[in-house]
UniProtKB/Swiss-Prot annotation:
<dbReference type="GO" id="GO:0022625">
    <property type="term" value="C:cytosolic large ribosomal subunit"/>
</dbReference>
<dbReference type="InterPro" id="IPR018263">
    <property type="entry name" value="Ribosomal_eL32_CS"/>
</dbReference>
<protein>
    <recommendedName>
        <fullName>Large ribosomal subunit protein eL32</fullName>
    </recommendedName>
</protein>
<dbReference type="InterPro" id="IPR036351">
    <property type="entry name" value="Ribosomal_eL32_sf"/>
</dbReference>
<dbReference type="InterPro" id="IPR001515">
    <property type="entry name" value="Ribosomal_eL32"/>
</dbReference>
<dbReference type="Pfam" id="PF01655">
    <property type="entry name" value="Ribosomal_L32e"/>
</dbReference>
<dbReference type="GO" id="GO:0005730">
    <property type="term" value="C:nucleolus"/>
</dbReference>
<comment type="similarity">
    <text>Belongs to the eukaryotic ribosomal protein eL32 family.</text>
</comment>
<dbReference type="GO" id="GO:0003735">
    <property type="term" value="F:structural constituent of ribosome"/>
</dbReference>
<dbReference type="GO" id="GO:0022626">
    <property type="term" value="C:cytosolic ribosome"/>
</dbReference>
<dbReference type="GO" id="GO:0005737">
    <property type="term" value="C:cytoplasm"/>
</dbReference>
<dbReference type="GO" id="GO:0002181">
    <property type="term" value="P:cytoplasmic translation"/>
</dbReference>
<keyword id="KW-0687">Ribonucleoprotein</keyword>
<keyword id="KW-0689">Ribosomal protein</keyword>
């Protein structure tokens, strides 16, 4: 039985396109990642019509759906079994994600304990070898 979220609203993003850096299309040495323009004559900073848009607080997501996964859960990073038990009372709101540096031996323990506690994991199959490969 899979665990379902307690509350699953429609997640609406105000803007899905990335904000790109001014003149990053013109020069290869400038990456596309956003950097705030600081020049005194910069037309992006002065918000001229037809220029790139600058990120601001108005593009923020709805507070209830911020950091929410498409499944309706919020992510919680888990490094060991003890951290997983924090999610026991919040298993309808948060799902666990096993951290990158956790060994495959500990991963098996975390996955087993998550099933017992009925806590959902985003990456339960990560780095788990089957019996035939061992």
């Amino acid at each position: 039985m899979t665990i379902r979220p307690a509350y699953r609203p429609k997640i609406v993003k105000k803007r899905t396109k990335h904000f790109i850096r001014h003149q990053s299309d013109r020069y290869a040495k400038l990456s596309h990642k956003w950097r705030k323009p600081k020049g005194i004559d910069n037309r992006v900073r002065r918000r001229f019509k037809g220029q790139y848009l600058m990120p601001n607080i108005g593009y923020g997501s709805n507070k209830r759906t911020r950091h929410m996964l498409p499944t309706g859960f919020k992510k919680f990073l888990v490094h060991n079994v003890r951290e997983l038990e924090v999610l026991l009372m919040q298993n309808r709101v948060y799902c666990g994600e096993i951290a990158h540096g956790v060994s495959s031996k500990k991963r098996k323990e975390i996955v087993e304990r998550a099933k017992q506690l009925s806590v959902r994991l985003t990456n339960p199959n990560g780095r788990l070898r089957s019996q035939e490969n061992e």
